[in-house]
Amino acid sequence: MAEVSSAKVLAGTTATLLVQADTDGCRVLVHKDQQHSIYLGGADVTTTNGFLFDHDGTVDISLPANAKLYAVSVSGTEPCYILKIGNA
């Protein structure tokens, strides 16, 4: 049975942890609806090496076991809405 959790995380101009996968991995939905872009990646994510997640939308990511997903904002803080679906 899958465990489901949700959170609102404010991504800042330095790498901000959005979610950490469980020991057997998880599926993560990240929704963003504000004006500035963010970049997704590992702990070393920046606006030059991250995966661009533009203004409006939702991205669906499968995280491997114990992986961590970070985000960094182009400007200020950007709210990111997280839905984590993991295995029990």
Predicted regions and their residues:
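Short, surface-exposed beta-strand/strand-loop-strand elements in extracellular ectodomains
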Residues: 31-49
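Forkhead-associated
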Residues: 22-33
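Surface-exposed ligand/attachment interfaces on beta-rich extracellular proteins
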Residues: 1-24
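Intrinsic-disorder/low-complexity, polar/charged segments enriched in Ser/Thr/Lys/Arg/Asp/Glu/Gln
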Residues: 14, 25-27, 56-58
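Short intrinsically disordered terminal tails
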Residues: 1, 87-88
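Edge beta-strands of jelly-roll/beta-sandwich modules across compartments, strongly enriched
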Residues: 38-40, 76-85
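Beta-sandwich interaction modules
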Residues: 54-66
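Noncatalytic modules at the cell exterior or secretory-pathway interfaces
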Residues: 26-28, 63-77
